[in-house]
Swiss-Prot record:
Name of the gene encoding the protein in the UniProt record: LYK5
Protein residues bound to ATP: 357-365, 395
Induction per the UniProt record: Moderately induced by chitin oligomers (e.g. chitohexaose (6-mer) and chitooctaose (8-mer)).
Designated name of the protein: Protein LYK5
Region of interest called Disordered, as start-end residue ranges on this chain: 251-270
Length: 664
């Protein structure tokens, strides 16, 4: 009896100490990108979940970005093991099957609890079935892609009995979702709930606090942050005093086209007697100028009807035209020249397409490129030019360029897409003037025999830049477009090694009315970058770009070309496709050693093997034979952003902490 009493007292004392000491222990440590290094075990206290330092269970909230196929309350509820009715109610949805727009933030009510099986961490349990429909899934892809970092690969590995190489279709995995209950300190401060928010691109602590009607101080303290630095796609706990409601917010899209801001008219202070007088004077002057310009235009038109040829000499400041061309389009200069255009729709389209572009004289381009000399040749029919002291690239195209290509290039405004600045047509040859890329193409860096090499961080940033450009093409311009010709020679690098995609000659409108699928009999492109469904059946979808992007990523990882021809005995040749090689690298045994052998030798050991493995898995999914198994560009961008974020903090010594499980 005494022994039982003593045991009961011991248990009571332990519980009292646990609940008395834990709240004073501070709040919850921020994961800080450690969730990306699956094999690093030294951060288990952070990556496995939020510590049980409050009540054993509570009402909590998660956030989830709507993304097909999880874009209804019903589908999200099944994925996260929560109530569809509660999701519908809190997010003001008409029905549980109402489609939620892609990238819309969804608030998820969830029951959070602490149990002995969790290892002392708060979590909300979900179950995920490896169906095999999405290719080779891993703990990393399930936690960070499917569940959008609401779990971690470390937590899943610790609570599932299957090894990384044992994951096969049909298995059910426990997915511990990160949640937490308020500590005594937070409760005393008036906070009743904790919400797990996934940091979006461009988010700040103050912005998150404002979004959820919380405070920066509460978020900083609640996540044990020592600075304002938070990383994209990492979970942050947001203390709330009331239950959250629908949040109307979307991730920041690419910057809109830059529009010149009209000059602001100074406003006279109240009581100024001259303000209205000067307005009337200004209106009178404007009307007079408009009348004068109209008269001059009429005279100019009559003069042109009598003499259609251009004057033999032009003012120096207006030497932007090719005097020998038979087509001319008004420019942005002070004098506008008009030459007879044919009545064809293509000519009309070309005229409207380049009205906002600078129109160059052929003689000026000759001078700028040293008469298109070999010394100025960059590659093929592209020449380096110096125009008004600035470098430019002039692309020579035999024949007239299409108005659709010019129209597309003119409206593209993204930092990762090469910018068209000017234009010239002479005797059936078109000259396109682009911004200059000081560091050439990634093909020059990866496949040349020189000593120059790209660092790991440069490579992952290049991959992300290209994904940003494709995401812009597929999702942000109207109508959406497919590049259709992505390859390493068309990925250019500026002076800061930021990537810009070029060569839009075969770009095609993505017709959403045809369910993102088109057919063609004219298959064109470079071997090694063409998706099998395009080569075999002429199928065109946005996944065509995803496939080519995957090949480019494999080039960045390995330094190899998309296609390698091996000479064999008796004159035979063996063609090796990089998109096929990766399957043998990541399959079977000794993955770690095979991956090391696959990596570009010029990198040496200066890269994080775990992140290289994750990037290789991403590339492998992009080049999947089945187009439905390939991720969308948006999904690709999400994973790459996490890899880039983690690579920023990586140091070579970090790999000493990693285990050898990749070779298992």
């Amino acid at each position: 009896m005494a022994a039982c009493t003593l045991h009961a007292l011991s248990v009571t004392l332990f519980l009292l100490l646990f609940f008395a000491v834990s709240p004073a222990k501070a709040q919850q440590p921020y994961v800080n990108n450690h969730q990306l290094a699956c094999e690093v075990r030294v951060y288990d206290n952070i990556t496995n979940g939020f510590t049980c330092n409050g009540p054993p269970s509570c009402r909590s909230y998660l956030t989830f970005w709507s993304q097909p196929p999880y874009n209804t309350a019903d589908s999200i509820a099944k994925l996260l093991n929560v109530s569809a009715a509660e999701i519908q109610s809190i997010n003001n949805l008409p029905t549980a099957t109402t489609r939620i727009p892609t990238r819309e933030l969804v608030v998820i009510p969830a029951n959070c609890s602490c149990s002995s099986s969790s290892g002392g961490f708060y979590q909300h349990n979900a179950t995920y079935n490896l169906s095999g429909n999405r290719g080779d899934e891993t703990y990393f892809s399930v936690a960070n892609d499917t569940y959008q970092a609401l779990s971690t690969c470390q937590a899943m590995m610790s609570q599932n009995r299957y090894g990384e190489r044992q994951l096969t279709p049909g298995l059910n995995l426990l997915v511990p979702l990160r949640c937490a209950c308020p500590t005594a300190k937070q409760t005393t401060a008036g906070f009743k709930y904790l919400l797990t928010y996934l940091v979006a691109m461009g988010d700040s602590i103050s912005g998150i606090a404002e979004m959820f009607n919380s405070t920066s101080a509460a978020i900083t303290e609640g996540n044990e942050l020592t600075s304002d630095n938070i990383f994209f796609f990492t979970p942050v706990l947001v203390p709330l005093t009331t239950e959250p409601t629908k949040i109307v917010i979307s991730p920041s899209p690419p910057p809109p086209p830059v529009v010149a801001t009209p000059p602001q008219t100074p406003v006279d202070p109240p009581g100024s007697s001259s303000s209205h007088k000067w307005i009337y004077i200004g209106i009178g002057i404007g009307a007079g100028l408009l009348l004068l310009l109209s008269i001059l235009a009429l005279c100019f038109y009559k003069r042109r009807s009598k003499k259609k040829s251009l004057p033999s000499s032009l003012p120096e400041e207006n030497k932007l035209f090719d005097s020998s061309t038979k087509q001319s389009i008004p420019t942005t200069t002070t004098t506008q020249w008009s030459i007879d255009l044919s009545n064809s729709s293509e000519a009309f389209g070309l005229k409207s397409a380049i009205e906002s572009l600078t129109l160059y004289r052929f003689n000026d381009l000759q001078s700028a490129t040293s008469n298109f000399s070999d010394e100025n040749r960059i590659k093929g029919s592209v020449y380096r030019a110096t125009i008004n002291g600035d470098d430019a690239a002039v692309k020579v195209i035999k024949g007239d360029v299409s108005s659709s290509e010019i129209n597309l290039l003119k409206k593209l405004n993204h930092s990762n897409i090469i910018r068209l600045s000017g234009f010239c047509i002479r005797e059936g040859t078109s000259y396109l003037v682009f911004e200059y890329s000081e560091n050439g193409s990634i093909s020059d860096w990866l496949h040349s025999s020189g000593k120059k090499s790209l660092t790991w961080k440069q490579r992952v940033e290049i991959a992300r830049d290209v994904a940003e450009a494709l995401d812009y093409l597929h999702n942000y311009i109207t109508p959406p477009h497919i590049h259709k010709n992505l390859e390493s020679t068309n990925i250019l690098l500026d002076s800061n090694f930021r990537a810009k995609i070029a060569n839009f000659g075969v770009a095609r409108i993505l017709d959403e009315g045809d369910l993102d699928l088109q057919l063609t009999r004219h298959v064109e492109g470079t071997q090694g970058y063409l998706a099998p469904e395009y080569v075999e059946n002429g199928v065109i979808t946005s996944k065509l770009d995803v496939f080519a992007f995957g090949v480019a990523v494999l080039e960045l990882l390995s330094g190899r070309e998309a296609v390698t021809i091996h000479k064999k005995k008796e004159g035979e040749e063996e063609v090796e496709m990089l998109c096929k090689v990766i399957n043998s690298v990541l399959g079977g045994e000794n993955v770690r050693e095979k991956l090391k052998e696959f990596m570009d030798p010029s990198l040496g050991n200066e890269y994080p093997l775990e992140l290289a493995y994750t990037m290789a898995q991403l590339a492998k999914s992009c080049v999947a034979t089945d187009l439905n198994s390939r991720p969308s560009v948006t999904q690709v961008l999400t994973t790459l952003s996490m890899i880039v974020s983690s690579s920023i903090d990586w140091e070579p010594s970090d790999d000493l902490l990693r285990s050898g499980s990749l070779g298992n």
